Amino acid sequence: MFNTNTSNISTNVYGLSQKTRALSHITAEADVNRFLVGTTALREENEIALLEAKEGEGVRCLSIFPHPKEIHSITSCPFDSSLFFSVYNTSGGGNNNSNNTNNNDNTNNNTNNNDFKSSLWRINESMDSIEELFELKGHTGIIKPILCDPSGSNNFIISLDDSNIRLWSKIDDQNEPTVIKQFGNLSKLSVGSINPNISNQLATANDVNIKGWDFRNAKETFSMDKAHSEQIRDIDFNPNKPYYLLSAGDDCKLKIWDTRQTRDPVKIFSGHNHWIWSAKFNRYHDQLIITSSSDNTVKLWNLYSLSSAFNSENNISNSNEQQHSQQPNEQQPQQPPQPVKQKKNKRNEDQLIKTYEEHEDSVYNISWSSSNFLFASLSYDGRFVVNNVPKEYSDILSYI
C-alpha cells in the first residue's frame, strides 16, 4: 500500500498509495523529526507509517503498522514516543467521493450511523508492530483528535465528540483511564486546544463559535460568538504568550485573538482561496504560523507584532534607553542631532512569507517538527511533504 522504496531519500516528498488525513509529530522524540501518518481506505486494510525526516537527506519510512478501519486522526503521546492515540471509523460507511472537497468533511453531522472509536496503541521496541492497549469508551458521534497535556505529562487527556468534552484520568500502559468530568453539551464541536501557559485552560470550536473552559471545574471562561462567518476547522494557543489564540476555517481567514478582549480579533490574515483545515504556531518562534487548505497549498506567515520576540526586543530596547538616561550628565558629551536611519526589516513585518505548492489535493494536516524550522504537510491523495522556513528568516531567528 505504501511506496517503501528508500533508494532515493533525498526528496522532501513521500507518497502513500491510499488516501490520508491523519498526521502527528512524535513530540517525545526531541532529537529527531519523526511523524505518524494514517490512511483512510474504506474497503482495504489501513496502515500507519512511521516516517523520519532529516535535513539534507529527505524523508524515509522506518516502519509500517497494520491498523483496523479508516483512520481520522492520530495523537502521539508527548510523555512516551511509543504511545499514540488513533481515532477511527469502524463502520466503513464514511464518505467515499475522494475528489470532492465537500464530501471530505470529517466534522459534519451527517454520519450518525458511523461508529467512531479511539484507542491507545503501543509501538513495540523493534518498531515492527503495534498493540492496542485500551479504548476510550462512551463517545457518541464523531470523535475529534485526542488532546494531551502540552507540558508533556501523562496526568490527563481530553477527548471531544460532536457535543461533549471529557476529561480523563492519568494515562499509562497498565491501567485504563476513567472519565473525571464530562461537560459542554454543545452543537457541532469540531476541535480543541489546551493552553500550555495557563493551568487547566481549554479552548473549543463549535460551528462558528469559540469557547474557553476551566476544564477542572467545567466552567466557561471566555467566548467568541460568530468568530468566523463559516465553520471553524482549527484553533491553536500561542505556546509562548498566555492569552493569544489562532483560529481558521471555511471562510479562508486566519484570525488571532486575545482571550481577555474577545469582541474582535487582533489580527486577520487572508490569502487562501478555499477552506483552511489546519493552522499551527511554531513552538520555538511563535511569530511563525503555518496553514493548510483545500486550495492545495500550505502557507507560512510571519506575525511579529503579536509575538514573544516583539515583547522581548522591546523590553531590551526600553532597558537600554533607561540605562542611558540615568547616566550622569557629565558623562554624556553633547553631540549634534544625527538623522535616524530606519532600516526596513521584513522579519518585523506581519505578512505572508511563502506559499508552498507541492500538493495536488486538499492539504488536511500540517505539523511542526522537533527542529525549529522544519514542518510537514499531508494531503488527501497520500502525499507527505516536508519543508523548511526560508533561510533568510531562519538565519535571523536563530540568533533571537
UniProtKB/Swiss-Prot annotation:
Xref: SMART domains: WD40
Spans of repeat WD: 138-178, 227-267, 271-311, 358-397
Cross-referenced PROSITE patterns: WD_REPEATS_1, WD_REPEATS_2, WD_REPEATS_REGION
Compositionally biased tracts (Low complexity): 96-114, 314-333
Keyword Acetylation annotated: no
Top-rank lineage group of the source organism: Eukaryota
GO CC terms in record: phagocytic vesicle
Membership in a protein family: Belongs to the WD repeat EIPR1 family.
Protein name: EARP-interacting protein homolog
Species whose genome carries this gene: Dictyostelium discoideum (Social amoeba)
Higher taxonomy: Eukaryota, Amoebozoa, Evosea, Eumycetozoa, Dictyostelia
Gene name of the encoded protein: eipr1
